[in-house]
Amino acid sequence: ESGAGDDTVIGDNGNAEFNETAILTRIETTAPTIGGSDTISTGQGTDIVLGGYDTDTIHTYDTSNTSDSTENDSDKVIGDNGKVTFENDGSISVFATTNAGTGAKDEIYTGNGGDIIAGGDGDDEIYACVISSSSTCNGNDQSRDIVLGDNGQATFDTHGILRKFISSDYGHESTLEANAAYTDTIHTGGGDDIIIGGIQADIIESGAGDDTVIGDNGNAEFDIPSWLDIDVQLKTPSDGLFTSADEWSIAADGNLTVFTFNDILPAIHREMAQSIRD
């Protein structure tokens, strides 16, 4: 438990590198099959957390305050093994899971703010929002969250602006085993969120905002270098192998663009998804 402040935490084994001006340039897990079940609480602040091996519970805000609207930090969390690299000025460069198949189910709670999250292996529960007493998003989060249910990578330009977001299994569906992916539960609040569930039957609940969701594996490429106004080109594999029925929910005052295969959708979004397939 690290409390408030800008914290950097590795649950199990890892390595952190700093440049000559003491700016963090790389953090990564090591010894990916050695570790235990961790409970990590970092409180408010811009935090970086790599859970490492085994089943972890990660909080980057005070979950006892279910009405918190002041926590608005941009956290970066990987539930299992992974790495995050930075430019010499501290802007993020690469956010990626590593050593797929060595992790486990995690619970991740990041609160408000523009968070970047990758669940990794296992049937993860991810809340990119402040949760209410009923374990749903309280609606205060208006920032863009980037969430990946399974394994993958986010790549940024030299200014720390997101350029590409891809699941590790994208383009490799024909070689996957049926047990190679996991059933995740993902909740995001308001804001124009971007979510890739990964294969298997995920449950995805996005709040108000213009959200973009890929139910299974996918690749999102960002063409306009603006965090506030992004033109997204998304791709999904055409075969739909090892995909399962996902469940979706979206707030009434938000818009949803869905790229998915064989999924359970409300009628209006099912028609949209069918037109995309065609």
Tell me what each language-model feature is.
Residues 5-42, 48, 59-109, 127-185, ...:
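Acidic/polar low-complexity surface segments
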Residues 12, 50-54, 60, 118-123, ...:
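Mobile, glycine-rich extracellular loop/lid and propeptide segments
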Residues 42-44, 110-113, 187-193, 197-200:
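Extracellular repeat-rich scaffold modules on cell surfaces
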